[in-house]
Amino acid sequence: MKTSMIPMTALLVAVVGCEPLSKRVDALDSSLWAQSEWISVADAPVFTGQSKDGARAADGTSWFVREIENEGEVKSAVWMTTGLGVYEVYVNGKSAGSDDALKPGFTHVKKTRRSFTYDVTGCLKKGKGEKNFFAAEVSAGWWRDKIVNFTGKKSAFRAVLQVTYADGSTKVYGTKADEWKAAIGGPVKHAAIFDGEEYDARVVPPYFGGEAFRKAERNDEF
């Protein structure tokens, strides 16, 4: 059996997150989804047809990044998220939901989309004018990797961030293709609840974007 060794420092980096500064909470009002859209990487490779001889989706994970400037002093922030594929979310380079590994878990790829909502107040820089980075990585999962057929074409991410400011006002930031940057990259090559996760610890996660990132595209597959 082929084995690999991951340095302990890499493991420590992988598990450090906002917890206990972030926690899973009840979902926001479902009507807020209307202020967002599914987004994908524009040039992501696409496999279609039947999966033969154990063929996998192309290596690599879809990454999405947005920088948001505080419009006032932040009192609280709640982030409602979902993905087409196995996904993880980050705030300012730290995991905001690592307790929910391999999200969304066992779901029907053609019928069900589970959302995961987190209070991320403790992850944020809170001063007026300060900026926070929100990021998501979405691998193929069952959505576009092998089961029998490659169901979806591209991994996608959708989210709604609701920020409450100290003056009592609220602002909703939904995923929009023209406001988020996207690219294929990161250390995760594949992830699925049966096959587990393939992770290259030599690769630095692009929590804050990078030169390869371009404007995301809208995804209307689901």
Language-model features: where?
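Solvent-exposed, flexible loop/coil segments flanking beta-strands in beta-rich domains
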Residues: K23-G72, T82
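Generic low-complexity segments that are intrinsically disordered, proline-rich and/or Lys/Arg-biased
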Residues: M8, L21, V46, P206-Y207
